[in-house]
Regions:
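A short, polar/charged loop-to-alpha-helix boundary motif
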Residues: 31-33, 102-110
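Single conserved hydrophobic/aromatic residue that forms the stacking wall/gate
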Residues: 1-7
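Short clusters of hydrophobic/aromatic residues that line enzyme substrate/ligand-binding pockets
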Residues: 35, 48, 101
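Short, flexible active-site recognition loops that position polar ligands and cofactors
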Residues: 107-119
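A long amphipathic alpha-helix within ATP-dependent nucleotide-binding catalytic cores
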Residues: 39-85
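Cysteine/selenocysteine-centered motifs that mediate thiol-based redox chemistry or coordinate metal-sulfur cofactors
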Residues: 121-132
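Conserved metal-phosphate-binding beta-hairpin within the catalytic cores
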Residues: 10-12, 68-101, 111
Length: 132
């Protein structure tokens, strides 16, 4: 199956060969990323790519792929990490197999950065569901 207008990028991608986006970073307005800072105050910022060293970004991308494969992931997921700023050590926080999907959510923003429009992303995820 091939969704309209997705080109070669998806001919090679699928549940067994997932796309691993660049690393994104949430910079909350306050100390924590609360409901208010996410949806109301518009002061929090999303950085794509994350404002961390390229080596750390590659480490995070590698971990994200391993986590997705370890749970036999299909379709989409967002893998969240913490970074200890003092030691540059990366810690797994969670894998979210149904991440937020609004236009301001991190997952669609990361896919847009990868070159996949929101409507094309929806088409592709439907195709991946049928491939299961």
């Amino acid at each position: 199956r091939m969704s309209r207008g997705l080109g070669d990028v998806y001919k090679r991608q699928g549940n067994d060969d997932p796309i691993v986006s660049r690393v994104g970073q949430i910079m909350p307005h306050g100390e924590f990323y609360t409901f208010e800072s996410k949806y109301e105050d518009e002061e929090s910022k999303t950085c794509i790519p994350a404002l961390v060293d390229e080596k750390i970004q590659e480490e995070i991308r590698g971990y994200a792929l391993k986590v997705f494969k370890a749970i036999d992931g299909h379709g989409l997921s967002r893998v969240d990490f913490f970074l200890d700023k003092k030691t540059n050590k990366v810690y797994l926080n969670e894998i979210n197999t149904m991440p937020g999907f609004t236009r301001i959510s991190m997952y669609p923003q990361l896919m847009a950065d990868y070159g996949i429009a929101y409507s094309d992303l929806i088409d592709k995820l439907i195709d991946l569901a049928f491939d299961r």
